[in-house]
């Protein structure tokens, strides 16, 4: 089990963290204590944050229907999460749920999200994951459906705040297997594409987990636009990426690429833009490749049509 959120002793002798949450409450605490935690002012503030992020996900079309889910770890084994069958754009604080690390519901009138097991797997595998955001932003999800890992060394911001974005193999949503596939990647990555599914990001706050979702979606959108301009996308050099990694290291932001040789950075051998544009190259020359055999067939058909028209 992952470590509990950091806490400090209160004046009354209890254990309260910087969010004002009583860390002495556990999943096996008396129901009255769990209800008191669930309805406390500190947790209500976190409920409001989740509802706010849910609205932003919905407004940006990162979720549709009842899709997407959010969670915040409150204590060692108690987690606040979104309900199932509720639009993230219209959630209210009273809709949220309380669960333990096995997914058993502890409080809340609505049923917890079916995908909470993935959130809990992430929290167990990564002690720093105190908040998790899962959604289906269309551009990043497009990469996930295509099974294409977003290329690196194109825009500095994603390198600093996220880094390389891996793809977790597909598993049925809501199953323990899906959570385990994602959890295998969160020790080195804060944002993961889920094959044929969507995106999940984690951080110490739900706001920052959402920021990461925004960053990866904007990046994937930019990359897709770039591939349609009829030119080979430009990358900055491995040396420039190393400079960014040095900045991350000074800031204390982990990245598995820190310490690699320059020749091992910006490796996008698997990146193959799948869209070409019909914009002619400079000088009016066509960028399309031609098949001589196909051209011969086209010419023969054209000549035959012209001969018949003349006759």
Language model features with spans:
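Glycine-rich flexible loops
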Residues: 1-311
């Amino acid at each position: 089990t992952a470590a509990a959120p950091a806490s400090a002793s209160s004046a009354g002798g209890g254990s309260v963290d910087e969010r004002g949450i009583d860390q002495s409450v556990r999943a096996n605490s008396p129901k009255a204590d769990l209800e008191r935690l669930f309805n406390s002012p500190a947790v209500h503030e976190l409920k409001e944050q989740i509802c706010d992020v849910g609205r932003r996900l919905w407004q940006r079309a990162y979720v549709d229907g009842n899709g997407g889910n959010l969670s915040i770890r409150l204590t060692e084994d108690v987690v606040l999460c979104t309900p199932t069958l509720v639009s993230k754009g219209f959630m209210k604080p009273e809709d949220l749920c309380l669960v333990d690390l096995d997914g058993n519901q502890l409080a809340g009138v609505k049923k917890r999200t079916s995908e909470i097991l993935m959130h809990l797997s992430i929290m167990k595998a990564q002690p720093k994951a105190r908040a998790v955001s899962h959604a289906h932003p269309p551009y990043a999800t497009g990469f996930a459906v295509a099974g294409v890992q977003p290329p690196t060394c194109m825009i500095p911001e994603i390198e600093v705040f996220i880094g390389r974005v891996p793809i977790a193999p597909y598993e049925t949503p809501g199953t323990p297997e899906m959570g385990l596939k994602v959890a295998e990647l969160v020790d080195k990555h804060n944002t993961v594409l889920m094959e044929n599914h969507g995106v999940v990001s984690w951080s110490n706050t739900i706001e920052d987990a959402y920021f990461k979702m925004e960053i990866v979606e904007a990046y994937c959108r930019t990359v897709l636009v770039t591939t349609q301009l009829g030119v080979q996308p430009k990358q900055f050099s491995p040396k420039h990426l190393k400079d960014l990694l040095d900045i991350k290291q000074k800031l204390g932001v982990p990245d598995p690429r820190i310490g690699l040789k320059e020749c091992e950075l910006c490796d996008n051998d698997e990146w193959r833009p799948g869209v070409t544009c019909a914009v002619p190259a400079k000088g009016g020359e066509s960028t399309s490749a031609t098949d001589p055999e196909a051209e011969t067939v086209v010419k023969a058909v054209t000549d035959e049509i012209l001969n018949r028209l003349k006759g």
